[in-house]
């Protein structure tokens, strides 16, 4: 029940469903963030200070929702003309409403436009929910079990060249990697503009972690990891053991604590992102969940309990 509808609904099988599933999940996140922003605008009124805090979040979220929705529709239509069936018509309505919403975010903020944005959100949610009762054209095309489960045909027998060469990319991990590198770069640049230094080793560790992710999610290793357990475990353990260690060495929380501004520094009557970060770090459940004892329990459970019991 906690999974986004696009992940559990009409894009779960078929050719290229791996692209569509990742895109649908990203679109759901973007839609959620942007919808929350426009809802706050409506409930609290279009105040300049509030608008300045929310407008770019809303613009980016709505744009991500539109881009993800286009890929979902492309996959579901299975090369048929858009609008040639009821599912396609529903998807066009969703895309048009989202596109209008994107345009609205770039117009001068008024209460009427905020309400119009809420209306577009309502249309998207209602039509998306209703369209899950319809059958996408992709479902009507006969496909092999491999295509239905993986989103692509089984590749030939693996060789070193195939495994290490560029392969089928993973949109989700690529997006996370780009956001991680760009966000870190912006934070470091902000710090240096203030005349403060930041460790080159931290920068190298952080970028190195995401480079590993991009490489693993873009080569033949990723394709074979979805179909063969041995390659799956190689990719899985690299993700779980090497990447987190490099990310931690990048000291992202320390960087955020130094870069983010407090409410007093912004002086617009709201809590600043630094205040929110510190409140989260000092929250007792956070200290417990991210403490060494909880980390040890999770580590033991994730390996020994799963692999050495009937759960596996």
Protein language model regions, located:
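Alpha-helical membrane segments of multi-pass proteins
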Residues: 1-312
């Amino acid at each position: 029940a906690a999974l986004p509808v696009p992940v559990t609904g009409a894009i779960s099988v078929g050719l290229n469903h791996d692209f569509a599933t990742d895109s649908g999940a990203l679109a759901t996140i973007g839609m959620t963030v942007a919808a929350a922003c426009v809802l706050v605008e409506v409930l609290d009124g279009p105040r300049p200070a509030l608008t300045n805090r929310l407008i770019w979040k809303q613009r980016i979220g709505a744009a991500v929702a539109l881009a993800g929705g286009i890929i979902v529709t492309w996959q579901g239509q299975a090369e048929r003309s858009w609008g040639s069936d009821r599912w396609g018509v529903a998807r066009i309505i969703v895309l048009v409403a989202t596109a209008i919403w994107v345009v609205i975010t770039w117009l001068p903020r008024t209460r009427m436009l905020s309400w119009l944005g809420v209306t577009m959100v309502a249309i998207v949610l209602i039509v998306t929910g209703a369209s899950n009762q319809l059958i996408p054209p992709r479902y009507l095309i006969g496909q092999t079990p491999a295509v239905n489960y993986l989103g692509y045909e089984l590749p030939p027998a693996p060789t070193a060249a195939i495994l290490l060469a560029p392969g089928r990319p993973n949109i989700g991990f690529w997006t996370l990697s780009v956001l991680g590198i760009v966000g870190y770069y912006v934070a470091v640049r902000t710090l240096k503009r203030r005349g403060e230094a930041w460790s080159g080793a931290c920068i190298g560790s952080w970028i190195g972690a995401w480079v590993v992710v991009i490489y693993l999610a873009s080569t033949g290793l990723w394709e074979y990891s979805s179909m063969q357990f041995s390659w799956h475990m190689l990719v899985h353990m690299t993700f779980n053991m090497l990447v987190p260690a490099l990310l931690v060495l990048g000291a992202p929380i320390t960087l955020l604590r130094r870069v983010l501004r407090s409410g007093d520094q912004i002086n617009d009557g709201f809590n600043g992102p630094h205040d929110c970060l510190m409140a989260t770090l000092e929250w007792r459940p956070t200290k417990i969940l991210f403490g060494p004892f909880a980390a040890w329990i999770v580590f033991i459970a994730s390996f020994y309990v799963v692999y050495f019991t009937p759960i596996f």
